[in-house]
Amino acid sequence: MPKHTKKDPREGAPSATGEPQKQAAGRKLFGTDGVRGVANQPPMTPEMALRLGRAIAFVASHGKSRQVRVVIGKDTRLSGYMLETAIASGVCAMGGRVMLSGPIPTPAVAQLTQSMRADAGVVISASHNPYQDNGIKIFGPDGYKLPDTAEEEIERLMESHELDEARVVGAAIGSAVKLDDARGRYVVFCKNTFPTALSLDGVKIVVDAAHGAAYRVAPSVFTELGANVTALGVKPNGRNINRETGALHPEHVKAEVLKRGAAIGIALDGDADRVIMVDERGEVVDGDAIMALCALRMLRTGKLPRNTIVTTVMSNLGLERALKAQSGHVVRTAVGDRYVVEAMRNGGYSFGGEQSGHLIFLDHATTGDGIVAALQVLAIMMEEDKPLSELASKAMQRVPQVLENATFATRLPLDSMQRTRVTVDRIEKTLGDKGRILVRWSGTEPKLRVMVEGEDASTIGAYALEIIEAAKQDVAGASA
């Protein structure tokens, strides 16, 4: 069982245009979720990946006299082969031993790193992004994503001469082996999070693996628990990951659920660290609804530490109201599952997640896990003998929420965007305590994201577009 420490991170939610920028000042390579970019273009080049592999092995070797062990997993992108080889070469060049899992979910790498007592785990994936992109995420020996300080040290090493002075030769050069049982280990891990007293015998389930990392393990997990599984998105070709399928396109799962009369649809993203569900009526159940459903069940059974969950500033106000009505509490963080996990560990909380479908059950896993999350929802359905539609609709009443994105060539600091700030301030005064606004730059894409909540959908939609128009004027003015 993963360990989580206790401190108290209860801190105020960020203001509309003042969300904390979690990326450390001066960092060039690492973003909010590792390194990400267009494959074979800076920074996501094999040259960078090789040096990154060397730096990972160097940092992991601190204080150890034995050979460093590193697990490397990937999703199904064509560029995964290129980057996998480069990172593995870098680790071997520093004397490390590489264990290659092949295509496997991000949470599987975290679990394997911990269970196999490796010194680090590396995931090659750009999550929900198209196949042309790729990324690299790093886990520590405890299965948690590396803290900012460790990433900063790795980046510093990559720019220094220390790595060149630490070369090994002869018999000290490392090696790489394939983990033939990696998928089987992870399937067993997932199944063990489902209560042994329950069964999925005969339950009709539709699973969409987005032609991604879970294309083999996801159908296996649910089938081995007895379910009647219809599998979508299980024919990766290196170029179709996330393409009109998976968590970003639950309409395909919806159609199949209605066609087959399934009890639930489970849509994963490319690396299976997040999930969006569809109930038996074809209604989408997002991360907020899943959190409400699971948190209220944990509250009723006394299994929610401090009656508190952790989520981000993007989660719907309805989630907060649902928890508050049952004497529960919500701690909000900046956007990014790593910051949710950070707050959970610091506060001794066990459950949290994001509206986008990253769901973290620290009693089971160290990071967001779409398959594990789906199993917990299925367990509640079995225990309460109720359909997902009933459970989800009763869990929370959603406040109308609008999300708008705009792509910009220039990324200005939010506090310098005067028209945007004035517009947001005016709308916030109009909304009062009946709504919220959040404006932020994406941590992984060149997009400005605007979220507005309020009682009337058409009104808040107009507000969101008004904010984006103000942002366009700010950027145009700065470029003139």
From Swiss-Prot:
Gene Ontology CC annotations of this record: cytosol
Keywords noted in UniProt: Isomerase, Magnesium, Metal-binding, Phosphoprotein
InterPro entries: A-D-PHexomutase_a/b/a-I, A-D-PHexomutase_a/b/a-I/II/III, A-D-PHexomutase_a/b/a-II, A-D-PHexomutase_a/b/a-III, A-D-PHexomutase_C, A-D-PHexomutase_C_sf, A-D-PHexomutase_CS, Alpha-D-phosphohexomutase_SF
Entry keyword Phosphoprotein: yes
Enzyme class, first EC level, given as a word: isomerase
Annotated spans, Disordered: 1-41
HAMAP family with a match to the protein in the record: GlmM_B
Identification of the protein by name: Phosphoglucosamine mutase
Gene symbol of the encoding locus: glmM
